[in-house]
Amino acid sequence: MSELFAGKYQLKKRLGVGGMAEVWLAELKGPQGFSRQLVIKRILPHLADDDNFITMFEDEARLAARLNHPHAVRVEEFGQAGDVWYLAMEYLDGGDLRHLTRRALTLGENVPIQVLLQMGGDVASALHHAHTLRGAQGQPLNMIHRDVSPHNVLVTTQGQAKLVDFGIARAESNQVKTRTGMVKGKSGYMSPEQALGRT
């Protein structure tokens, strides 16, 4: 069973749900047998009328669309279908780093250190790209992801690491500002500055 969303995306399988949005594997079909898999992230129905959540989602879309890096997930479209806002993003065949390391442990193996170092370098490169982005007038955006964790690092079947989910990222251009002292992210993976509320 699948649902047609936004008049063009066939939702195939729900991949996950969070506090603000749900994520779906989708297929975009076109003429002459064209077909492409994408991921759709859409605001949960009970938040569709919450202006604060919509603005946060718009901030995420704006930030993610600026990223043009081989180790950051690519945003294809930002839109609204009825009263539901959504992002269409590239589909990455693979799994998250958390799943990869747990699977290795289940098999009694470790992920080779060279592989982990390469993935760490890939993610660091994506973070550097995000942090050094500039706005239309050349002003620094000072983007900080704030939720780097194994759950938000996807590893493709070709072994490429990509950083995903800029949902709580902070940037100078955000319309919604985090209150001073408010901490966002997973405590086990926070930088000391983030844990102390300095980002």
Sequence positions of predicted segments:
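Protein kinase glycine-rich loop
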Residues: 11-18, 23
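AlphaC helix of the eukaryotic protein kinase fold
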Residues: 44-66
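Activation-segment/catalytic-loop signature of the eukaryotic protein kinase fold
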Residues: 78
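Conserved short submotifs of the Hanks-type protein kinase catalytic core
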Residues: 82-96, 100
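AlphaC helix of the protein kinase catalytic domain
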Residues: 97-111
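Protein kinase catalytic-loop region centered on the HRD/HxD motif
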Residues: 124-143
